[in-house]
Amino acid sequence: MKVVFLEDVKGQGKKGQIKEVPTGYAQNFLIKKNLAKVATAAALSEVKGQAKAKEKEEAELLAEAKALKEVLEKDETVVEIKMKVGQTGHTFGAVDKADIAKALKSQFGLKLDKRKIQLINKIQALGTKDVPVKLHRDVTAMVKVKISEA
């Protein structure tokens, strides 16, 4: 019996895949547990429609990420964070992902999830540093972060 998988089934098939499976297995397990349905013309067109919608949504997300990358990589987009500095020139504390995200929102109105900022070590020195931001799996932007004395 030909079925269209509605969810991933280990060892059988992935979501949206059309596959020939034993009739008993299809009727008693896959269809009963709503993991698959019989591959009729209506079911096939529904799966194709879902695939097109998912593809369109993915393209929109990619375009949005590319537009945000353009904004973040402009020369005038420099995130400035002020820190207290001791007499020896060392900073008190460090700048982390959350601080950068908060500064982006307050200075440029860009709401960015701190988990997308790819900062390996906290910034503890004065100066300018390029910080990578992963906006999409295919799009990574570099943000300039300037740490200055308060």
From Swiss-Prot:
Give the organism, scientific name: Lactococcus lactis subsp. cremoris (strain SK11)
Question: Gene name on record?
Answer: rplI
Q: Which Gene3D superfamilies match?
A: Ribosomal protein L9, C-terminal domain, Ribosomal protein L9, N-terminal domain
Provide the family line.
Belongs to the bacterial ribosomal protein bL9 family.
According to the UniProt entry, its GO molecular function terms are: rRNA binding; structural constituent of ribosome
What protein name does the entry list?
Large ribosomal subunit protein bL9
Task: Give GO BP annotations, semicolon-separated.
Answer: translation
Q: Which UniProt keywords apply?
A: Ribonucleoprotein, Ribosomal protein, RNA-binding, rRNA-binding
| A GO cellular component entry from the record | ribosome
Tell whether Acetylation is among the UniProt keywords: no
